[in-house]
Amino acid sequence: MPLYFITFLGTLAVALLLYLAAVSYAAVTRRPPPAFIPEAGMAWLQAAGLALLWFIVGVCWLAFFNVYQIHVDMSAIGDAAFHAFSRGYTRRLPIVVLPYAAACLAWTLALWGASTRIPRRAVWGIATLCVISILSTPWAALALDDMQDHGYTEAAYRQLQTSHLVRSLALTIAAVWALVEKWRLPWR
């Protein structure tokens, strides 16, 4: 397994653990998690999270409407073309998966920071949407793996598109929400 993929999985695991810990803390104490990240750090973290979210939203919709459609085209040409495309796609994944993992980590980490430009309730919503996107990821990965191992099938393609649509919608809503909250509040 390539190092970038181990990094990707590890980052998603940390994001999920941070989210679960925040949910558990809030459920038990009926208070938000303690703010370990000061306001100045949170301003930078939220800005980075917002930028990463919008980058990933663009990538998600490009993949949904363009890149994944190429699987259908390549399968029509033949198995050799399809597998060559799949291998090339997999080799180029770091540019997609590492910023995605960083965005999810930024927003789940923001649950543990002081409230700044984006209110705590919005941070919870954005982090939850990031977690929903993480939970949809295995189905897309399994569909891609199935197509790489056994070639293109309509069922695997539908699974890929459906799970990717869930991820794309969740991240788009999160990005719009973060942007609206960032603009809504007066600048300090």
Identify what each model region corresponds to.
Residues 10-25, 57, 101-112, 126-134:
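Hydrophobic core of alpha-helical transmembrane segments in multi-pass integral membrane proteins
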